[in-house]
Amino acid sequence: AGKTTTLMAISGLVDAAEGQILLDDMDITDCRPNSIVQMGVCHVPEGRHVFPELSVYENLVAGAIPCKKLPRAELQNRIEQQFELFPRLKERSSQMAGTMSGGEQQMLAISRGLMSNPKLLMLDEPSLGLAPIIVEEIFNMIEKVRKAGTTVLLIEQNASIALQISDYAY
């Protein structure tokens, strides 16, 4: 129904077919994806796209690359914040991402996105193919991020769990 395509258009990964994409009253319709990330928009796509040959730690560092000239102390602070959200990632910080379970990869994908310190976090089907206990852990983290002031745009098939943490549903 075009949900993923809409997220991709907001992210600058595909051209919008028509209309404008506004962020804080600024037209970002024709902006490049890296610029959109620098403006505070993060898109965590469906399918747990991690860098399999990089460690958990290296994946998190990669998430901060769009943040130009981020001081090393701030980079470490953001990594520690992700380890607080997902303690399991800290335990596996030197593990190659490709050897992790699907749930752990999803945690890493979300945490890597949060490394850019977004104002808007867009999540596309974060529970897809995951065990119920992992889904609960991920949604608890999403709720913490939302309560900390980050706007979350969530595309999710599991309506019951999504509605539990939502302010609005469409």
Specify the residue positions occupied by each region the protein language model found.
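Glycine-rich phosphate-binding loops of nucleotide-dependent enzymes
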Residues: A1-Y170
